[in-house]
Amino acid sequence: GATGPSKGVRYTHRQLAAQRDAIAGQYGITESDRLVAAFAPFALYGPLLGIPSVVPDMDVAAPATLTARALGDAVERIGATLVFASPAALANVVETAGDLTPAHRRAFADVRLVLSAGAPVRPDLLHAAARLFPEATAATPYGMTECLPVASITLPEIDAAVGGDGVCVGEPLPSVDVRIRPLGGSGSTAEPDVVGEIVVRAPHARLGYDRLWYTEHRASQPAGWHATGDVGHLDTNGRLWVGGRLGHVIETADGPVTPVGLEQRVESLIGVDGAAVVGVGPPGVQQIVVVVRGTAPPRRARLAGLQLQDRVRAAVAHPVAAVFEVATLPVDRRHNSKVDRARLAAWAAAALDGGRIANP
């Protein structure tokens, strides 16, 4: 339910076995590994892979409650070699890293792989987390409940992936086929630089949904493939880039605009800690609105000051109708990491229509 209403996804034993093999093969996981999973469902991969796994002392329904000390206790307790955490969990670990003991830091030095997923992971956050695990490879897999993993990318590969529009999630796994269904077009293609919905096929892709027959029909076109609802493109090196959700594409008079690449540009500005780019107005003539959370956020939402507006507009390089500052950006309940752009779009539309500017 991180990108919409919760829904049951059906898997066969064969598909779960294929998922186990895909994860183990991609990350070289053996029976000598030990997993700390700061996201409760991911802890189930431990028994599936035949390795010990624990969940740190945290509120599993609120990943952002994970502290560095709690993670350190878990890693030290089982001698973990693998760590998985959502971006929100990692961010709080970095924020509270001053509470780590020397024993925690020694235990962190034995971790060989740190994985973070559930939403786009900012490179600066991954770098900060990697410094806590000096011997570990930091990587972020891309996928969804219906097919995980689809692709994977390491931190050095992220650093090398510049100049694209969106988040580079790496090359698809060997067992995964990826195609792009062009926006406003038909069919699907693996040609580079075509923007559209990402569709995938893999031995570990879902069988279907639980009693959601229309959803299953829509998500199974073409037959044998899963339509992810994500928008992106493949580059000339075969790497997959994700630009946002299909329902969050902004349909301007100049053509469709995907939000993630623009959000990254805004988040690169000094004093900006988070950003969301949404569309307001009828499809085909939608206007771009940018919502910013600063490093020193206001107590109440407001229109941004002229200086910040100018900096945001220069970074976005598209016409921007308004720039708002907020205290917090609404996020999903599952990972605490995915910005609720639909909610922000409705909030921004009401504010621009003369409504009271309250916190979203």
Question: Model-found features: residue ranges?
Answer:
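Conserved AMP-binding A3 loop
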Residues: 1-18, 52
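Conserved C-terminal "lid"/linker of ANL adenylate-forming enzymes
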Residues: 250, 276-279, 289-290, 309-360
